[in-house]
Amino acid sequence: MSSGGLLLLLGLLTLWEVLTPVSSKDRPKFCELPADIGPCEDFTGAFHYSPREHECIEFIYGGCEGNANNFNTLEECESACAA
């Protein structure tokens, strides 16, 4: 195979890796936890991954405790949990 063909193959494999969704078996276990508002009342917007919806969803967070399925931004949630 020529070097141009190898570069094309490498580029296609890289693109496939980037675009391939995270499978549920590769997703961290904390992504399966339910949204948890926590006991505090410093209400703010946060994001959690919803296994049922297969996407990150905004919810109201109380500001303390809760669980690990809690992200400040949609991007953080998608990076950790979403496909």
Swiss-Prot record:
This is Kunitz-type serine protease inhibitor microlepidin-3. Belongs to the venom Kunitz-type family. It comes from the Eukaryota. SMART domains: KU. Keywords: Disulfide bond, Protease inhibitor, Secreted, Serine protease inhibitor, Signal. Expressed by the venom gland. GO terms for molecular function: serine-type endopeptidase inhibitor activity. GO terms for cellular component: extracellular region. It comes from Oxyuranus microlepidotus (Inland taipan).
